Amino acid sequence: MDYTKQPILFKIRKAARYVRLYGVRRTLVKVKGQYHSTRTFATLPAERAERTGRHVGILGCGNFAFSHIAYYLRKNYGSVIRGVMDPSIHKAASLFEEYDADDYTTDAKRIIDDPQIDLVFIASNHASHAEYAVDALAAGKSVHIEKPHVVRYDQLERLCDAMTRSPGRVTLGFNRPNSAIGREIRKQLWSQSGSSMFNWFIAGHAIAPDHWYYKPEEGGRVLGNLCHWTDFVLQLVPPEARYPITVTPTRAEKSDCDIAVTYVFGDGSIAAITFSAKGHTFEGVRERFAAHRGNVLISMDDFKDLVVENLDRKQRISQLFRDHGHQEAIRASYALVRPRDGKLNEGVTREYVWQTGDLFLRTKDALEQNRVLVIESGEPPTSGGGGGGGGGG
């Protein structure tokens, strides 16, 4: 839904609701982000002379880059953005102007080859994420790759291979596990032993059939949306207990929304993810999570309210605003190149990049083929080896 074209009363109600959910500053930048996406310039702004302290590049200047990546970079570190790129020169110019960057362009190579840039945030169209990441790693840059980091197995293999060859480090844009509530969920569940039960219900926006997500090369909504929750459940299962993973789809006409998927992990843990997209959700994506391991029962709503029960103890955590972990994700990525609390972030491992990508790619296969699939192992292939993640069932 294009909020800029809605009646004024709708806009007022939407903004007022978001102030309650996110606070005034976050709501303001979200509103600006909506207008940024459609802004055009009669005369493009002049580029600025090179200035010291600006060392970050952004590839893709859509709403997410504007209202999350650039916003949290400036909030935490000031004016550190050196150059930005988008296929739309107007979006690039808008982000450049709002966040006081030095350079804007439609040429990704100009950002990747800039010697002043040592960290690249990739938030472009999904099919380009891995391609830009491989090029940036080859140029010695560290990279933050927004989800999904790949849309095909050949990209996953090339990305993992590039990680072994580059001095650059990598982070992925799966923000939820590192939110305050996400960290608390994992801490509480990992205080117990044995297998777990996880249940996600997600209500997302319906999007038009001609939306760019649905272009064959972009991977659809499993890779564009569902990967957030496949990654979350993967990270809740201890690495040594994950494999094999049995993926069972439940679907009707569609293969990437109004669907459910269940996973049985190697230790007997079971996860169910239900993704509904039937209309407009006024408060944004809605999420409800429940889990049980040992004596711990978890219930969570919208990364705002969490209830933890352990035998006779009951703990309620209610945050003032929703926090999906975006700020923490940006701060962790910035620490790839600038120390945080005295040390650099080493980034994610090649094994994790493979495993979370393999899981959402196999989930997409299972839903499209409407059959059970088994992922036998989480071991990345050797350089030049074949992919595919596992056999069918």
Task: Name every feature range the model reports, one short phrase each.
Residues 1-49, 119, 335-393:
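C-terminal helix-rich "cap/oligomerization" subdomain common to oxidoreductases
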Residues 99-144, 148-162:
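Beta-loop-alpha module in the N-terminal Rossmann-like domain of NAD(P)-dependent dehydrogenases
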Residues 52-68:
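Glycine-rich adenosine-cofactor-binding loop
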Residues 209-286:
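Rossmann-like dinucleotide-binding domain that binds NAD(P)(H)
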Residues 269-334:
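NAD(P)-dinucleotide binding in Rossmann-like oxidoreductases
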Residues 77-96:
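NAD(P)-binding Rossmann-fold cofactor-contacting core
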Residues 145-146, 170-172, 300:
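Hydrophobic residues in well-ordered beta-strands that form the structural core
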Residues 150-209:
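A contiguous active-site-proximal alpha/beta segment in oxidoreductase catalytic domains
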